[in-house]
Amino acid sequence: MYLVSLLSSCCLLVLLGTLPARAAHEDPVEKVIEGFSRGLSNAEREVGKALEGINNGITQAGREVEKIFGELSNMGSQAGKNVEHGLDKVAHDINNGIGHAGKEAEKFAHGVNHAAGQVGKETNKIIHHGVSQGGSEAGKFGQGSHHAFGQGGNVANKLGHETHHAFGQGGNVAHKLGHETHHAFGQGGNVADKLGHGGNVADKLGHGTHHAFGQGGNVADKLGHETHHAFGQGGNVADKLGHGTHHAFGQGGNVADKLGHETHHAFGQGGNVAEKLGHETHHAFGQGGNMADKFGQGAHHAFGQGGNMADKFGQGAHHAFGQGGNMADKFGQGAHHAFGQGGNMADKFGQGAHHAFGQGGNMADKFGQGAHHAFGQGGNMADKFGQGAHHAFGQGRDMAETFDQGAHHAFGQGGREGGRLVQGAGQGLSHAAKEAQQFGHGHGHGYYAAGQTWQEGDKVIHPGVSQAGEEMEQFGQGVRHTIKQAEKEAEKVAHGVQNGVNQAQKEAEKVAHGVQNGVNQAQKEAEKVAHGVQNGVNQAQKEAEKVAHGVQTGVNQAGKETQRVGQGVQTGFNQGQKEAEKVAHGVQTGVNQAGKETQKAGQGVNYAAGQAEKEAEKLGQGVHHAAGQEMNRLQQDVHNGVNQPSKEANQLLNGSHQGQGGYGGQHGGAATTTVVSGASVNKPFINFPALWRSIAATMP
C-alpha cells in the first residue's frame, strides 16, 4: 500500500515535472516572438536595401549634377577664354593701328623736321650769303669811306640799332609765334585731354576734336596773321632798312667803320632770327612737334590727350575711346565695362559672372551656396536633399516608428495575454499546489486519506486541468487573437511598410523626377547661360567691333585731322617760307640796295680818289714839269757853267800851248793845270759858289 502510494506520488511528480517542460518546450508565445523577430529582421533588411538603393540613386544623381556643373564650368571657362582671346585680338589690332599711326606720325614729324631744317639751312645760307656779301661790300666801303667822309651823325649806329630793333621786334614776334602756336596746340591738347576724360566720346570726339582742331584752326589763322604780322613787321624793317640805309649812306658819318660791324650785327641779329626761325618754325608746328624727341614718351600729345595710348596703353590705353573703354587699364578688373553694365564679366567672373546673363544666373557667385536657384524654387534639392530625403522617408520613418510602436503594442497586447496566461497558469498551479499541500498534510490518514487525496487529487487535477485547459484554451484563443491581432498589425505594418516603401519610392520617384526636372531645368538654364554667354560674346564681339570701328573711325578722324593739321602746318610753313622768302628777298633787296649805295659810295670815293689822284698826277706832273724845267735850266746852267770854265780852261790851255811849244806845252798841259796844282792859275777850274748862286737864282 505504501509502495503503491509511493509510486503514485512519483508518477504524479514526474507528470508534474514533464508538463511545464513540455509546455516550455512547445511554448507558442516564443514561436510568435520568433516569427515577429524574423519578420522585423526581414523588414529591416528590405528597408535597408531600399535606403541603400535610394542612397545610391542620390549619389548617382549628385555625380550627374557634378558632371553638369563641371560642364557648365568648362563652358564658362571656354567662353571666358574666347572673350579674352577676342579682346586680345582687339587690343592687338588696336596696338597695331596705334603703332602704324605712330610710325606715320613719326614719319610726318621727321619730314616736318627735315623740311624745317632744310628751310632753316637755306635761310641761313641766304642770309649768311647776303650778309657776307654785304659785309664784304661794307668792309670795302669802310676802308675808303672813313677817309672820304668826315661828317654825318651816328647814322650807322642808329641804323644798326633800328635794324636790330626791327629784327628784334620780328624776333619777338617769331618768339610769340612759337608761344602762340605752342599755346594753340597746347589748347588743342587740353581739349584733347578733356576729350580723353569725357565719356561721351562719340559725341565729343566729333565736336571736341572739331573744337580742338578748330582752336588749332584759329591758331593756324593766328599763325597766318601773326606770321604775316611778324614778317610784315620784318617787311617794315626791310623797308626801313632800305630807307635807313639810303639815309645812312645819304648822311654819311662814321658809316664805314660802324657799318661793317653794325650792319653785320644787324644782319647777324637777323641771322639769329633766322636761326630762331629754324628752331621756332619747328616749335611753331606745335608742342606736338617734339614728336621725334618725345615720341617714345608722349608721341600722341599732338593728337590730343586721348593719344597717350603708347605711354599708357598698359594702364589706360582706352581713355581715348571713352569712360567705358578703360579696357586696358581695368582689363583684369572691369574689362567689360565697354560692353555694358551687365558685362562686368572679367572682374566679377569668379564672383558674379552671370550678372550679364540675368538675375537668375548668379550661379558663379552663389554656386556653392545656392546653385540650384537657377533650377527653380523646387530645386533646393542639394541643400534640402538630406532634409527633404529624410522628410520623404520621414513618413516612412513615422510608419516605421508606428510599426515599432504598433509591433510593441501588438507584442504588448500579446505580452498582456501571455501575462494573463502565466497568471492563469500560476493560479491553476497555485490551486493545485494548495491541493498538493493539503494532500501532503493528509497523507498519513491511510487509504481514506489516499482515496480522499486521490479524489481530491482528481478534484484538484480535473478542475485544475480543466481550469488549465480553459486557461490554455483562453490562452490559445488569446494567442490566436494575439497572433491574428499581430498578423493584422503585421499586415498593417507590412502594409504600412509597403505604403512607406511605396511612398518612399514615390518620393524617390518624385526626387528623381525633381532631380530630372532640376537637371533638365539646369540643362535649360545651362543652355540659356550658354545662349546668354553666346549672346554676351556676340554682344562683346559687336561691341568690340564697334570699339574697333570707333577706334578705326577715331584713328581715321585723327588721321584726317592730322592731315588737316599737316596741311595747315604745311600751309603755315609755306606761308612762313613765303614770308621768309619775302624777308630774305627784302634783306637781299636791302643788301643789294646797300651794296648799290656802297658801290655808289665806293664809286664816289673812287671818283674822288681818282679826281684827287688826277689832281695829284696833275700836281706831280706840274711839279715834275717845274722840276723838269728847273732841272733842265739847272742842267743847262750847270752845263753852261761847266762849259764856260771848260771853255776858259780850253782857252787857257790853248794859250799855254801856244806860248810854250809842243814839248813844253805838252809838259805844262800835263803838269801845270790849276786843278792839279792850283799854283799857276789865278781862277779855279769850277767856281762852286757861283754855281749854287746860279741854281738858286733859277729856282722860283
From Swiss-Prot:
Composition bias, Polar residues: 641-654
Gene Ontology cellular-component annotations: cytoplasm; extracellular region
Region (Disordered): 133-158, 183-258, 283-391, 641-669
Biased composition (Gly residues): 658-668
Superkingdom classification of source: Eukaryota
Parts forming coiled coils: 488-546
Swiss-Prot/TrEMBL induction comment: Up-regulated in differentiating keratinocytes.
Compartments reported by the entry: Secreted
Keywords: Coiled coil, Secreted, Signal
Residues in the signal sequence: 1-23
Tissue: Detected in epidermis, in suprabasal keratinocytes. Detected in suprabasal layers of embryonic epidermis and in stratified layers of embryonic tongue and palate. Detected in adult stomach.
Membrane-crossing segments per the record: none
InterPro entries: SBSN_GxHH_rpt, Suprabasin
Record protein name field: Suprabasin
Species per Swiss-Prot/TrEMBL record: Mus musculus
